[in-house]
């Protein structure tokens, strides 16, 4: 009976020692998310970060790194969206000038084109504010990280 108990304890110790560190298991997913951002595949990067959260709840170091990296993903995505909105606005501005050339200010076509241009300008400004927001958020996290020495 004593031998069985000792054998059971030894088996439990061996089984508990063989568990892998969750941080080392989750690290490849974070690296894959980084590669997805380099390739401008933001949906895949977000999905990988979400899978780290759900599949490795005990991998605290990698989860913190993923949390910080998600801000970087959002920042890069916002920069792309801002560039797109800016180019659409510039095209709309040229179109507005072309359509309204020679028409009086009170003409319905001018008014409609002006409203369209205003909505494009608002979208461009919204995207630029989004870029600034994520840039400030990343800068604040870096300041906090330097002060505390933590992730």
Whereabouts are the PLM-identified features?
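Sec-dependent signal peptide recognition
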Residues: 2-8
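C-terminal motif of bacterial Sec signal peptides marking the signal peptidase cleavage site
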Residues: 13-16
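Start-of-domain marker
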Residues: 18-65
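Short solvent-exposed coil/turn linkers within tandem alpha-helical repeat scaffolds
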Residues: 53-64, 96-111, 115
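Alpha-solenoid repeat scaffolds
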Residues: 59-60, 80, 127, 148
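Alpha-helical linker/edge segments of TPR/alpha-solenoid repeat scaffolds
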Residues: 70-95
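Short, low-complexity, Pro/Ser/Thr/Gly-rich segments in the mature regions of secreted, periplasmic
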Residues: 127-151
């Amino acid at each position: 009976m004593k031998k069985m108990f000792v054998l059971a304890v030894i088996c439990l110790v061996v089984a508990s020692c063989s568990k892998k560190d969750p941080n080392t298991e989750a690290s490849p997913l974070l690296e894959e998310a980084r590669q997805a951002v380099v390739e401008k595949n933001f949906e895949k990067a977000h999905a990988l970060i979400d899978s780290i959260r759900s599949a490795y709840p005990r991998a605290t170091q990698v989860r913190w790194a993923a949390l910080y990296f998600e801000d970087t993903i959002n920042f890069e995505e916002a920069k792309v969206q801002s560039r797109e909105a800016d180019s659409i606005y510039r095209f709309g501005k040229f179109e507005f000038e072309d359509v309204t050339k020679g028409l009086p200010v009170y003409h319905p076509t001018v008014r409609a084109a002006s409203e369209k241009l205003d909505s494009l300008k608002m979208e461009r400004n919204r995207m630029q504010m989004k870029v600034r927001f994520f840039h400030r958020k990343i800068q604040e996290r870096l300041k906090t990280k330097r002060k505390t020495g933590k992730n």
